């Protein structure tokens, strides 16, 4: 059993990470910053300078911003935030946009000078918007986390100023307490009332958007394409996860519970585990514990990687889902550890080239590797310590992945952004 302080810490991590968001979180962060700019300035800016970090540009460029009439990109995210955003709603800042607002977005874009630049910054997530209106100006800056305002100013009067660091974990729960053994123990023994409000809502919201992704045409329809070829349980688990991303990346307005700042990761960590559990006849409480395990394994991996990087986050969530499914299949700590290491050995290095329709296919691939990772273990086959980036044990391997992503792939990130913006 875990002590009370560790149970409280793990519960707090889930409460902090499993947040409800409408739309891909990077354009939503831009819209949130824009809504706050309008609030500070006292009206809609007539001119805007947007200073945006490369990783935000990458993740906003190709994804459809919900409630904008199918528009994509930084300008659309700024415009919807200015015209109709509710800053108090944070990650649901554009959840209540009306049809009249959608029409007003184009009018605002046509009449407003919006200039976008990409300055050097120590923060991978960095959004600074400066606006001018009727002789006044204001500035709002969000950094490190999607709703973390570190600076606000109007007409030279500083309203808020926090230190700028490049650490996305600043002011968040200490995640150094996470380890695979304790995650499993927590998932197996935590009182269900501790996790039902967060993980239960995650299952409800994320399976709903996955169903929408299968019922209607969204993006490249990866989910429904997978189901055309097979109906076995593994394909269904992959397809349902991919379908949620099909819808989310292509402008579906249904909210999603995120993990590590990402809706795709929130979907991937939960939906395939839920689907497998349902197909195998597991009860709802058991599925809740399995998704909890998947979430925490995903968060544990992502702590070293960072919220935004050149390393595809859906891969980490796919590995987490594989571990959750392995637990439902009877795996203990040894089996789950080998599942993670086997999967990481297969798929590490998959790049993030921005939020877009093809994320759904990467999700399917990540979940597939997670499932295969346990199948290998169950058959007595495992990759060994020292095979590539695999460490002496699972915690060592997770650290290696963090170093690979946060340090080794920095130049990869710059090259991806250069290709995307040329």
Would you name each region that the model predicts?
Residues 38-40, 66, 276-289, 299-365, ...:
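Hydrophobic alpha-helical bundle architecture
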Residues 109-251, 416-422:
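Signature of multi-pass transmembrane helix bundles
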Residues 10-19, 56-65, 247-258, 298-308, ...:
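Glycine/charged-rich beta-loop-alpha catalytic/anionic-binding loops adjacent to active sites
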Residues 2, 21-25, 55-59, 63-66, ...:
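A structural signal for small-residue-enriched, beta-sheet-centric alpha/beta enzyme cores
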Residues 31-124, 131:
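Early transmembrane hairpin of solute transport permeases
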Residues 20-36, 254-271, 312-316:
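Conserved phosphate/anionic-ligand binding catalytic regions in large, soluble enzymes, centered on
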Residues 1-11, 44-58, 232-251, 283-301, ...:
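Acidic-glycine-rich active-site phosphate/pyrophosphate-binding loop
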Residues 44-48, 89-94, 116-117, 193-199, ...:
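Flexible, glycine/charged-enriched surface loops at secondary-structure junctions
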């Amino acid at each position: 059993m875990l002590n009370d302080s560790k149970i409280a810490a793990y519960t707090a991590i889930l409460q902090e990470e499993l947040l409800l968001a409408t739309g891909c979180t990077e354009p939503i962060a831009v819209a949130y910053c824009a809504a706050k700019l309008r609030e500070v300035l006292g009206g809609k800016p007539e001119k805007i300078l947007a200073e945006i970090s490369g990783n935000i540009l990458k993740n906003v460029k190709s994804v459809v911003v919900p409630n904008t009439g199918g528009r994509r990109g930084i300008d659309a995210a700024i415009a919807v935030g200015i015209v109709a955003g509710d800053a108090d709603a944070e990650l649901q800042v554009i959840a209540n946009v009306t049809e009249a607002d959608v029409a007003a977005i184009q009018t605002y874009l046509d009449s407003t000078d919006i200039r976008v630049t990409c300055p050097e910054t120590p923060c991978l997530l960095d959004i600074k918007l400066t606006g001018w209106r009727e002789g006044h100006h204001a500035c709002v800056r969000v950094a490190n986390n999607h709703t973390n305002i570190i600076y606000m100013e109007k007409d030279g009067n500083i309203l808020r100023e926090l230190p700028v660091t490049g650490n996305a974990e600043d002011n968040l729960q200490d995640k150094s307490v996470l380890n695979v053994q304790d995650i499993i123990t927590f998932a197996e023994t935590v009182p269900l009332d501790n996790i039902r409000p967060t993980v239960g809502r995650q299952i409800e919201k994320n399976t709903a958007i996955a169903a929408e992704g299968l019922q209607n045409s969204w993006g490249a329809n990866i989910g429904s394409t997978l189901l055309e070829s097979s109906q076995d349980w593994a394909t269904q688990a992959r397809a349902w996860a991919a379908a949620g991303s099909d819808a989310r990346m292509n402008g579906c307005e249904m909210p999603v519970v995120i993990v590590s700042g990402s809706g795709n990761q929130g979907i991937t960590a939960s939906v395939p585990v839920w689907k497998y559990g349902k197909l195998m006849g597991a009860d709802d409480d058991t599925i809740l514990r399995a998704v909890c395990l998947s979430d925490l394994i995903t968060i544990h991996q992502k702590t070293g990687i960072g919220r935004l990087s050149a390393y595809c986050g859906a891969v980490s969530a796919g590995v987490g889902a594989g571990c959750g499914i392995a637990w439902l299949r009877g795996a203990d700590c040894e089996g789950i550890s080998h599942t993670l290491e086997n999967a990481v050995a297969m798929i590490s290095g998959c790049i993030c080239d921005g939020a877009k329709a093809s994320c759904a296919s990467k999700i399917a691939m990540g979940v597939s590797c997670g499932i295969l990772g346990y199948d290998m273990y169950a058959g007595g086959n495992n990759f060994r310590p020292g095979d590539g980036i695999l460490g002496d044990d699972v915690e060592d391997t997770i650290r290696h992945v963090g170093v690979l992503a946060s340090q080794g792939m920095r130049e990869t990130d710059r090259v991806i952004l250069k290709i995307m913006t040329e």
